[in-house]
Amino acid sequence: MEEEFVVTPWEVRGRVDYEKLLKHFGAKPLTKDEVALLEKYAGEVHPLIRRGFFYAHRDFDFIMKWHGEGRPWALYTGRGPSGPVHIGHMVPWILLKWFSDKFGLEVYFQITDDEKFYDDPEMKLEEATNWAYENALDVIALGFSPERLHLIIDTKDIKPLYPIAVRVAKKLTWNTVKATFGFTDSTNIGLIFYPSLQIAVAFLPTELRREATPVLIPCAIDQDPYFRLARDIADALGYPKPSTLYSKFIMALTGESKMSASNPDSAIYTLDDEKTVRRKVMNAFTGGRPTAEEQRKYGGNPEVCPVFHYHMLFDPDDASVEKIRQDCKSGALLCGECKLKLHEKITKFLKEHRERREKARGKVDEYRLSVKLSK
């Protein structure tokens, strides 16, 4: 019998049933009506939405209508810096950049070195903060300007955040956070207070602009508990409720529901060299048959194949992706050839990304919010 899946902000285990998870969290599926609203205002729909990577939301229709009224809004997401960045981490950031470009929006990006320090018994605070700076390079490398991107490294940029977090904390009871996050008597008080900080960023643009400025938060579905609480207390604090857009997890190269830092071969990291990328891709699990002869005769199953999943991520051309799907199903495309095509796409992306990443080194402070506010 298959183990029941587990999804929390700190752990994802088992084969995730996304529809069941949606019902459990109480978020709404992203329908063609919301997608049509986005297309109306953006002029197009990003492939990550079109292809179903982002599949659920809270009040996405509200933020689109708010935009239609010409009112201000902003973007928010984040990263827990527990180690190097892999491609799965970057999926919400890529969509974030697209929204920023399409709608001319400022981006608030929280890097939670404090949370990772609290959560990992072996993690030193200095190590978490060093990873925060390293991970920030991957965010900047997506092409954000310092005018648009506001980085918040929690231990370095707490000043504008803390007064809001204090007000948030006063509205959250122990019973509420215990029930929401599964905290126990052995949970350290850092983790218990931490949700106040992640929620606070959702209200920060309103404070800074001194007018109602709701945020749209593209993130993985496991972050929903934080923003459910944010929405529950927003009215009482006089802030607009944040809207959210939730993604599925990026399938592991090994075939599991989610990439895992505990198994480096399950993911492609931005710092992986070409040889490592090639090895990981060529060794990846597939939806193909055991032999080339059977593949040609019966075809493969792209829907369970991480290699096809990655083609959907890296190929912007719908016709090209559909051809790979059909050629796999018909047996015209063998797994080895499909993997080589993917390796080429990933190598090109990472080469360009790493060049931009190195150019960003030494410039992180130009993007930090507290540095900008102190000038």
Curated annotation (Swiss-Prot):
Q: Which domain of life is it from?
A: Archaea
Intervals of motif 'HIGH' region: 81-89
Indicate the family of this protein. Belongs to the class-I aminoacyl-tRNA synthetase family.
Which reaction equation describes what this protein catalyses? tRNA(Trp) + L-tryptophan + ATP = L-tryptophyl-tRNA(Trp) + AMP + diphosphate + H(+)
What EC number(s) would the UniProt record show? 6.1.1.2
Q: Which gene underlies this protein?
A: trpS
Any idea which UniProt keywords this protein has?
Answer: Aminoacyl-tRNA synthetase, ATP-binding, Cytoplasm, Ligase, Nucleotide-binding, Protein biosynthesis
Motif placement: 'KMSKS' region: 258-262
UniProt xrefs under HAMAP family? Trp_tRNA_synth_A
Catalytic EC class: ligase
* Keyword check for Cytoplasm: yes
> Tell me, what is one Gene Ontology molecular-function annotation carried by this entry?
tryptophan-tRNA ligase activity
Q: Does this entry carry the keyword Protein biosynthesis?
A: yes
Please report the name of this protein according to its UniProt entry. Answer: Tryptophan--tRNA ligase
Q: Which InterPro entries match?
A: aa-tRNA-synth_I_CS (IPR001412), aa-tRNA-synth_Ic (IPR002305), Rossmann-like_a/b/a_fold (IPR014729), Trp-tRNA-ligase (IPR002306), Tryptophan-tRNA-ligase_arc (IPR020653)
A GO BP entry = tryptophanyl-tRNA aminoacylation
> Could you tell me where this protein is found in the cell?
Cytoplasm
Q: Which GO terms describe its cellular component?
A: cytoplasm
